[in-house]
Amino acid sequence: MADLKAVQEADVRQRPQASIKLFWKELSAVVKIGIVNSNLITTFAGMWLAFYFTGERFLENLHIVFFTLFGAALVIAGSCSINNFIDRDIDQHMERTKTRPTVTGTMEPRRVLWLGVTLVAIGTMSLLMTTVTAAIVGLIGVVTYVFLYTLWTKRNYTLNTVVGSISGAVPPVIGWTAVDSDFHIVPLILFLIMFLWQPPHFLALAMKRCEEYRAAGIPMLPVVHGFEMTKRQIIVWVACLLPLPFYLFSLGIPFLIVATVLNVGWLLLGLWGLKMKDDIKWAKLMFVYSLNYLTILFVAMVIATIW
């Protein structure tokens, strides 16, 4: 009897822990924590470069760092939550999205919507603690992602990837404008790098998940026009990245070498796809390369300023 009682007491203690763990898992899925984290890398890089080029000291402006990263994280998380609410009808048809709480019903859709709106509101207020420009840029990202991408182009046009790339290119600009609202070539180049990076990244993903997108009725380029055209477009987008690092020449020769090697390597891998017979394998390689590319490039920008 004593052993049974001990087991029951242990079970009671573990239940709250399991519930909390499940809650955070579901919350992470709703806000798409992976997207939030990756975008915070580019947000931080944009902010760091703004400190560097304006001569402002990082450690003397930690309040700006906090409000920028906190605000950007909430704005991005809120946008993703609203996206989950809107896409719950098509997410059930895709393997990678069918377990989201909005599909399984473990989180009520209306609560997910209000969560998203609340996060965007708090995030915007946080960005306002830095500059009005940063808050406006953040809201531009929200409007583009929620309305122009999710509600309009995603289900209707193959250009959905391009439209969605606008919102994905906003985070480094948020980071920069939180420090300096004046026009500068650097945030423009960061925006273009992110804008051009996304089509090859997401088109490679679309090739990997082509049949899932087809089942969901989403007109991704490989679904509508096939793999060959998709591969050619991916190569064009990657090629457009080649000159951009040279506009950041003030970061030094080592950075230019790293960036150029990354760009040329990605382009060569893309061209290899024209001869490679296994399109899915090639798409997987391109997708993984794109993830490493983004991380290495933006980390290299930061390192270049302190090396």
Curated annotation (Swiss-Prot):
- Subcellular localization: Cell membrane
What EC number is given for this enzyme?
2.5.1.141
**What biological function has been recorded for the protein in this entry?**
Converts heme B (protoheme IX) to heme O by substitution of the vinyl group on carbon 2 of heme B porphyrin ring with a hydroxyethyl farnesyl side group.
Q: Which GO terms describe its cellular component?
A: plasma membrane
Per the record, the similarity remark reads:
Belongs to the UbiA prenyltransferase family. Protoheme IX farnesyltransferase subfamily.
Q: Which organism is it from?
A: Geobacillus thermodenitrificans (strain NG80-2)
List the NCBIfam families: cyoE_ctaB (TIGR01473)
Indicate the quaternary assembly.
Interacts with CtaA.
Which reaction is catalysed here? heme b + (2E,6E)-farnesyl diphosphate + H2O = Fe(II)-heme o + diphosphate
Q: Which GO terms describe its biological process?
A: heme O biosynthetic process
Keywords, ordered alphabetically? Cell membrane, Heme biosynthesis, Membrane, Transferase, Transmembrane, Transmembrane helix
Pathway assignment = Porphyrin-containing compound metabolism; heme O biosynthesis; heme O from protoheme: step 1/1
Family matches, as Pfam families: UbiA
InterPro entries with a match to the protein in the record: Protohaem_IX_farnesylTrfase, UbiA_prenyltransferase, UbiA_prenylTrfase_CS, UbiA_sf
Q: What is this protein called?
A: Protoheme IX farnesyltransferase
Q: Which GO terms describe its molecular function?
A: protoheme IX farnesyltransferase activity
**Transmembrane segment boundaries:** 33-53, 62-82, 111-131, 132-152, 159-179, 185-205, 229-249, 251-271, 287-307
Judged by the first EC level, this protein's enzyme class is: transferase
Q: Additional comments on file?
A: Carbon 2 of the heme B porphyrin ring is defined according to the Fischer nomenclature.
> What is its membrane topology?
Multi-pass membrane protein
HAMAP family in UniProt:
CyoE_CtaB
